[in-house]
Swiss-Prot record:
Cellular compartments annotated: Cytoplasm
Species for this entry: Salinibacter ruber (strain DSM 13855 / M31)
Keyword Cell wall biogenesis/degradation found: no
Family matches, as InterPro entries: ITPase-like_fam, Maf-like
Annotated protein name in UniProt: dTTP/UTP pyrophosphatase
SUPFAM superfamilies cross-referenced by the UniProt entry: ITPase-like (SSF52972)
Regions annotated as coiled coil: none
Cofactor(s) of this protein: a divalent metal cation
Catalytic activity: dTTP + H2O = dTMP + diphosphate + H(+); UTP + H2O = UMP + diphosphate + H(+)
Length: 204
């Protein structure tokens, strides 16, 4: 168990993302995963930072209402290029188009993190932003990567943690884990700022 993150109440992850689950496993924090019934529809005009902030809160609240004694964590990640949000590709053709757009340029990855403890009527939400630069990609490289199937369930059409990523990710400015889907340092700082009483280590 992580000595810096020992909670006095259950932690519920309101997410279906295997990457977020893997990150919490990696830092050795016990949690239960729940699927949030939240509607993730937003107006197309919503700015990226506000979109992830809104959706993270929206995902956390119904799960927290069912378990008021637990601390609920929800997150939402989007990729944005020139201010336009790029969600998960609809199909292989869409994924190839996304990668052609993102290759040899910079884009931003936004993740909203929301923590809700319904028992004490507290909510804390934060947004982390990371800049990512992809190198040039040939059409053959794009087709091969998309054919692997990996891009199809990822915002922006690529996964920073994929074994092929070192070949095309040129530079990252900011939190790597944010690009994976859960900014761990931001999560910890938000916990300490708003839920210090639930962190057993903080009172030791």
């Amino acid at each position: 168990m992580n000595p810096l993150l020992q909670l006095s109440c259950p932690l519920l992850l309101a997410s279906q993302s295997p990457r977020r689950r893997a990150l919490l496993d990696r830092i050795d924090v016990p949690f239960e995963a729940r699927v949030s019934p939240a509607d993730e529809t937003l107006a197309p005009s919503v700015a990226p930072a506000e979109a992830v902030r809104t959706l993270a809160r929206r995902k956390a609240r119904p799960v927290a209402a069912d378990r008021p004694s637990a601390l609920v964590l929800a997150a939402d990640t989007v990729v944005a290029h020139d201010g336009e949000i790029l969600n998960k590709p609809e199909d292989s053709s869409h994924a190839r188009a996304m990668l052609r757009r993102l290759q040899d340029t910079s884009h931003a990855v936004y993740t909203g993190v929301s923590l809700v403890h319904a028992g004490s009527d507290r909510t804390a939400t934060a947004v982390e932003t990371t800049a990512v630069v992809l190198g040039p990609l040939s059409d053959a490289e794009i087709r091969a990567y998309v054919a692997s199937g990996s891009p199809l369930d990822k915002a922006g059409g690529y996964g920073i943690q994929d074994h092929t990523a070192p070949f095309f990710v040129e530079r990252i400015e900011g939190d790597y884990y944010n690009v994976v889907g859960l900014p761990l340092r931001r999560l910890y700082r938000t916990l300490r700022a708003s839920f210090a009483d639930l962190l057993e280590a903080s009172s030791a």
